[in-house]
């Protein structure tokens, strides 16, 4: 082997070494494996929530009835597929705003009815007291008869008593209906609030999306 061949072999060996780029692996960061929740697991969770709702007390009060409604809404959110859940969530947020406005109006109506009932009750008691005293005391009866020329004062007192009593009964009946509407509206708010909250949660209970511009509760 001559000197030229040895020099050519050495140069080709150096070129091969320069052409090889050393591989540096990226840094390793350990992460937890992503666990997927199957439909059967979601159905199992839904049944567990329904069992919790049925195993609680009989719902004698409004708060317990609202709790049962909330459990049912969460179970419904777990049963629904993801696209339907998102649609119901968006619709539920808008409906919650409307229900809150309606609830405020019902509470104002209830307050007005309470004021009317208070006034009518006081007038009824006063006129009943005057009418009863006129029956017992003859002097009061004579004064009410306006010097014997007529009993228009007495008729006015009795008419006012009858009117206020009728208004009191009517206002009480309307107030009962308003209370039922308020209880039903609060239950609807609890159901939709629970569904929206469940729809914005991942399978492990961590919140994924924050709700904005929506306030719940009283």
Curated annotation (Swiss-Prot):
It comes from the Viruses. InterPro entries: Orbi_NS3. May play a role in the release of virions from infected cells. Belongs to the orbivirus NS3 family. This is Non-structural protein NS3. It comes from African horse sickness virus 1. The gene is Segment-10.
């Amino acid at each position: 082997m001559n000197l030229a061949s040895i020099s050519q072999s050495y140069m080709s060996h150096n070129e091969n070494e320069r052409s090889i780029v050393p591989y540096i692996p990226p840094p390793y960061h350990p992460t937890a494996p992503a666990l997927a929740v199957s439909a059967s697991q979601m159905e199992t969770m839904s049944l567990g929530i329904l069992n919790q709702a049925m195993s609680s007390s009989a719902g004698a009060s409004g708060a317990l009835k609202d709790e049962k409604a909330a459990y049912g809404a969460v179970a419904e959110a777990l049963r629904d597929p993801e696209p339907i859940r998102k649609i119901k969530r968006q619709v539920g947020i808008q409906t919650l705003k409307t229900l809150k406005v309606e609830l405020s109006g019902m509470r104002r109506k209830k307050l007005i009815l309470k004021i009317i009932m208070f006034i009518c009750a006081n007038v009824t008691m006063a006129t009943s007291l005057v009418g009863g005293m006129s029956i017992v005391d003859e002097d009061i009866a004579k004064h009410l008869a306006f010097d014997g020329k007529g009993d228009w004062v007495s008729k006015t007192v009795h008419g006012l008593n009858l009117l206020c009593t009728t208004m009191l009964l009517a206002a009480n009946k309307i107030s009962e209906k308003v209370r039922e509407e308020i209880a039903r509206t609060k239950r609807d708010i609890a159901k939709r609030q629970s569904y929206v909250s469940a729809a914005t949660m991942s399978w492990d209970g961590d919140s994924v999306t924050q709700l904005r511009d929506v306030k719940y509760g009283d």
